């Protein structure tokens, strides 16, 4: 849902954890099914206001799923906070996931956070919560894969539950059976897009986790200049954002700073966060050897 110039917009992170079911692992293999369950559970709070709460991205950590939620409108956010405070959101998520996994019980634990901290302890102070959520404007577009799932589900007649269940089952069986290299690059290949570097022609493709990890391991103190070069064509990588990354991950070292830089680039640009753009930024800063290493990586991350 596109926000108008005067529309109230904000975002928040919703952390979901279960001690009985490994949610990150399940999500990897049942992405469409779990995404639809979470989307359905969260939309219960909108009371008919379609697209007023949107899941922009789902991150996986070791033990939990982290949903990046966008609110379009003050009232939907107020209703969500009210339902969350009364544990209705948690119960909806629990029930939907329980049905997904066909288990009798599925206790879950949730937590709301913004960039500067958690919100659960402030739920009695609604105005303060709304202020913090409003201040955290969404900085990324919807994840390409989630948008693709949305489009597929829209094409199904929602008044036919059997058709929806059949489609979700098919999607998940395909996700489980595809080889990792095929699954991870499904629909991402840029047909016919090539570029030249040091006299050789290369096929462009979106950045993978292997590219990000190799960059973070190799770039060292030059991560900031590369970030500024990328920032010329990526609004999310402005000087303030780069300095915030430097400060926030200072204790974690340059690897983590560089890693988070490319994660932000990829999250904000989606499919447009390509190898070519990173290679150009590296070349601009005289880091041709790193660029060549990245170009030599296979899809499995090996040279």
Curated annotation (Swiss-Prot):
Protein name in the entry: Tumor necrosis factor receptor type 1-associated DEATH domain protein
UniProt free text on domains: Requires the intact death domain to associate with tnfrsf1a.
Subcellular compartments: Nucleus; Cytoplasm; Cytoplasm, Cytoskeleton
Keywords in alphabetical order: Apoptosis, Cytoplasm, Cytoskeleton, Nucleus
SUPFAM superfamilies listed in its UniProt record: DEATH domain, TRADD, N-terminal domain
Death domain boundaries: 208-298
Motif (Nuclear export signal): 141-157
Single biological process term from Gene Ontology: extrinsic apoptotic signaling pathway
